[in-house]
């Protein structure tokens, strides 16, 4: 089953649109946003899928084959239209094959990141 990625720390959120308690990005300004999720997985072989979900349904995804040495990132990006009130996105990860994986690999270079960037109004 898919697991929600818990981006639980913020570096920058000028409009208060990301909620670190439910891990959702809910823009308060209607428009098109570039959504980027980079999820770093631990060092085991197999395939992972990183998914952007909009309002509870899969919107975009990226599958990544990982090797057994070092951790690797899987990046998914998509342009998403938001209504400025109730539309939201979340990021999920799904292990397609291989042995159990963890997020990150315990060093400072294994950071997972999320961003939602306003591009233009509707």
Where are these regions (language model features)?
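Terminal (often C-terminal
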Residues: 1-46, 62, 69-70, 99-122
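Short, surface-exposed beta-strand/strand-loop-strand elements in extracellular ectodomains
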Residues: 45-58
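Short, surface-exposed tryptophan/glycine-enriched loops
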Residues: 71-96
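Intrinsically disordered, low-complexity segments enriched in Ser/Pro/Gly/Ala and basic residues
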Residues: 1, 20, 56, 77, ...
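Residue-level recognition of well-ordered beta-strand positions that form the cores
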Residues: 36-40, 51-53, 79, 92-94, ...
